[in-house]
A protein has these predicted regions:
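Start-transfer (signal-anchor) and selected internal transmembrane alpha helices
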Residues: 1-21
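Membrane-interface helix-boundary motifs at transmembrane edges
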Residues: 2, 117-121, 166
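Hydrophobic alpha-helical transmembrane segments
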Residues: 5-10, 99, 127-131
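Membrane-water interface at transmembrane helix exits
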Residues: 82, 113-117, 163
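Transmembrane-helix signature of polytopic, membrane-embedded enzymes
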Residues: 112-135
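Membrane-interface transmembrane helices that cradle and orient dolichyl/undecaprenyl
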Residues: 158-166
């Protein structure tokens, strides 16, 4: 049982260790991370902080629904946990958004590990596979697109649930 706890803790913290230059703010994520994805989170957070639930974004054309906008992740439960955490610390910063984004790789790691274990793959092999996969360019490149990374992170959990139910 202690080994399982250690494995899950390792799976959760490993992306933060591997991405230490980002985790400790030596590097920043480029592309659309700040100008596009962070802006949605900041807009929603600031309105929530002022006591208003933002259902509509008036800044895009003649306006656009935030609830049905997949880029805003308005109804995504981890986003609301993130907003609550940011409310506790008092601000939603680009750094806290980056930590939220990296946490998606942790979600992916746990899901992939659970999925591989359903096939009775040895723990060491499954752990090694997950750690190598989580540092691959295809996974870490998605840091530029937080919504895509969070959507990708839950794919293995879905596969695990489907496999367990059959």
């Amino acid at each position: 049982m202690r080994t399982n706890k250690f494995i899950y803790i390792l799976l959760i913290i490993f992306p933060f260790i591997f991405l230490a230059p980002l985790t400790f703010q030596y590097l920043e994520v480029g592309n659309d991370f700040e100008l596009y994805h962070f802006a949605y989170k900041k807009y929603i957070f600031e309105l929530l902080k002022s006591g208003h639930i933002p259902l509509w974004s008036p800044s895009e054309g003649a306006g656009y629904s935030l609830i049905f906008n997949p880029l805003a992740q308005f109804v995504y439960i981890p986003s609301w946990i993130f907003y609550f955490f940011c409310f506790l610390i008092g601000d939603l910063s680009k750094y806290s958004f980056l930590i939220y984004t990296i946490s998606a790789i942790s979600i992916f790691n746990v899901g992939l590990f659970l999925y591989l274990r359903t096939f009775n793959i040895d723990v060491k092999i499954a752990l090694t596979t997950v750690l190598i996969t989580s540092i691959s360019l295809k996974v870490t490149e998605l840091l530029r697109f937080p919504n895509a990374l969070h959507a990708f992170a839950w794919c293995r959990h879905s596969s695990w649930i489907l496999h367990k139910s059959t």
